Amino acid sequence: MPARVLNCKSIRLGSYGEKIEIREPEAATSTPESEVEMQRINFDEEVRVAIVGAGGYGRVALDVLLAGGIGDRVLGFYDDAHAALSGEVRGVPILGDVGMLKSMLSVEPVHVVVAITDNGARLQVANALRSLGARFLTSVHPEAYVSAVAVVGDGCVAAPGAIVQPDAALGSHCFLGPRSVVDRDAEVGAGTWISAGCVVGPAARVGARAVLGQNSSVGRKAVVDSDVEVGALRHVDREGG
C-alpha cells in the first residue's frame, strides 16, 4: 500500500536489502517496483487523521501535522491511558483508547499516525491496526528534507531539520528526530528511533526497532543489529553495533 504522505514530494514506499529487516514481516508488501511511487493525499477531499499516543511523541507528531497545514483534519488522540490524561492536547481532544479507534476503522477509513515511543509497542499496535484496514500517514515537517530517490516506509515521522539522502531506505514507523541524518545508501529497519542530531553514515545498516541516542553516529558501512540501543554521543564503526 503506497505511503500516505504529508507535505513532501519525494517519498516512496518500498523495501529492499536482503540482510536487513526494512519492514516487519506482518506488514510486508508485495507491491511491484513499478507501482511503488508515492501517492499524495488529496487534502481537498475529506481526510481524517487519528494519532495513537497522546504523550511526548504524540505532541511531536501533532506539531508536524500542524506545520503541514492539516491540523484541522486531526480527529484526535487515542491512548490506552486516556483516563489519566487531560482531555486535550493543544486543543485536540483525547477521544479514548485504541480499542475505540479499532471500532471506528470497521466503519470508516482513517489515516493513522502511531506515535508511541516504545518501538516494539509501536509496531505491534501498527500491525494490529493495519490488519483492520488502517492507512498510515507518513508525516514530514516542511523544514525536513527527503531525497526524491530515497525510500521511506509508511507511518514514519520526520521532525524539523531531518535529512534523508539519496538511495537511503527506512522501514515503516520510524522516527527521525530534529537535525538527524540518514546518509546515502543507508538502510534503517522498521520501527527504529533516530534521535535528535544522530547521523547514520553512508551505506550503514541499522536493524529493526533500534534506538539511536542523541548525537550518536553510525559510521560508513557499519551495522547496528535489531533491538540494539546506541547511547547518546556514541559512535559505532564496526559490524554488529
Q: What feature does the model see in each segment?
A:
Residues 139-241:
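Structural signal for interior beta-strand "rungs" in well-ordered beta-sheet cores
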Residues 46, 72-74, 109, 133, ...:
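A general structural motif
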Residues 82-145:
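Phosphate-bearing ligand-interacting subdomains
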Residues 11-87, 102-105:
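Hydrophobic, well-ordered beta-alpha structural blocks that scaffold small-molecule cofactor pockets
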Residues 71-74, 91, 109, 133-134, ...:
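A generic structural signal for alpha->beta connector loops
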Residues 56, 120-121, 151:
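Short alpha-helical
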